[in-house]
């Protein structure tokens, strides 16, 4: 999983932040409202009880479990969608990243393409891998 590091308020780049977390042996990548992202990650760390799903409207997330199964969360629903595609992307750079991966780029290069060709994706690009089972 790879991500850029931009955080915008409206059209203004206000800070650099991490967008991927390790939770329960898996990876969680998020895009959208910063407060909602932190609430979503906290919800996952606390056990992801569907009855306690935070009120959110402006968030996209990809959650990859320790076995490599990817699920997508979108806004108001606590029901994830299983991702069966070979690759996926979220956030402001999604269109460029998807095109780059279709053309053969790995996740790092896809995010680098988004940084180069979109206005709201910014470096540094960070790459995360699932930890090896021992």
Per-range role (PLM):
Residues 1-134:
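N-terminal nucleophile
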């Amino acid at each position: 999983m790879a991500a850029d590091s931009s955080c915008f308020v409206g059209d203004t780049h206000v800070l650099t932040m991490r967008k991927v977390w390790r939770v329960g042996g898996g990876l969680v990548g998020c895009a959208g409202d910063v407060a909602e992202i932190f609430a979503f990650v906290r919800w996952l760390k606390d056990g992801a009880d569907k009855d306690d799903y935070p009120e959110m409207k402006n968030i996209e997330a990809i959650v990859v479990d320790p076995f490599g199964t990817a699920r997508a969360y979108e806004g108001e629903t606590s029901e994830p969608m299983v991702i069966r595609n070979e690759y996926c992307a979220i956030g402001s750079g999604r269109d460029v990243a998807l095109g780059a991966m279709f053309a053969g780029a790995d996740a790092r290069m896809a995010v680098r393409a988004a940084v180069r060709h979109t206005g709201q994706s910014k470096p540094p690009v960070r790459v995360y891998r699932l930890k090896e089972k021992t």
